[in-house]
Amino acid sequence: GKKNFLNEPDTWDVLEKVKKLADEFKVSLLPEIHASYSEKIYEVVANKGYMTYDFFLPGLLIYAIETKSGEVLAKWANEIQEKKIRVVNMLGCHDGIPLLDLKGILADDDIQKMIDTIVGRGGFVKDLHGAKNMYYQVNATYYSA
C-alpha cells in the first residue's frame, strides 16, 4: 500500500543506518531523486544534510536549446544556489532523458511539446509503469533530441 519512493519515516531510518556505516569508512551517500520538481523532494533530502542526485538538468537544457531561452534553466540553477542545495547532475544516462522530473518547473504543454519534438526526431517515450500517456522519460541521445 505504500508508494515506491521516499516513504517517511522508513526511508530516513534506513538512510541513517547506512550513513552510520558509511561514516566509519568516510563514504558519502548520494540519494537518487526521481520525482517531479513540484514535489520538492530534493529540498527534503538536502534539508536532511544529503547531497542530491536529481534529474532536472537534462530536460531543462534541451528545453533551453529548443526555446532559445535559458530563463527556466537559470531559475533552477539560481534556486539551488540560493538554497545551498548540493547536487550531482548528469546530462545523459542509460535510462534516457528524464521528463517526469520536469513536472512543476515546466508547464505540461511544454513537456508535451518536447516529447513531440524528440519523438519526431526518432526518440521513443518510455511510459511510467507501462501506462500509456504517462510519460517517464524519452529514449534518445542529445544529438537526436
What are these regions (language model features)?
Residues 1-145:
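Active-site and adjacent substrate-binding regions of carbohydrate-active enzymes
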